[in-house]
Amino acid sequence: MTVTIECSEIQTKEDFHRLFTKSLYLPGFYGNNLDALHDCLTSLPQKTVINLVHTQALIRNLGPYGRAAIAAIAHAERENPERLTVNML
């Protein structure tokens, strides 16, 4: 599965989690926090490529939370390289 996420559309933490939940088909019990996102990304059932477009907008709009989100996603990629590829554009 390949997913493209337009980060400039994200204005709030809620937007971030809503968009990731929808784009990655995260389970209904997803906790809407970065720890839960990390857990989901490290246990993906299939090979997934995530293209994050305009990551600087995520940092600009969410500040430290945006930086933490990018760090969590990158960490998940390092832990699950056979199933997760992240391109930050």
Positions of PLM-derived features:
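Positively charged, polar, low-complexity stretches
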Residues: 1-89
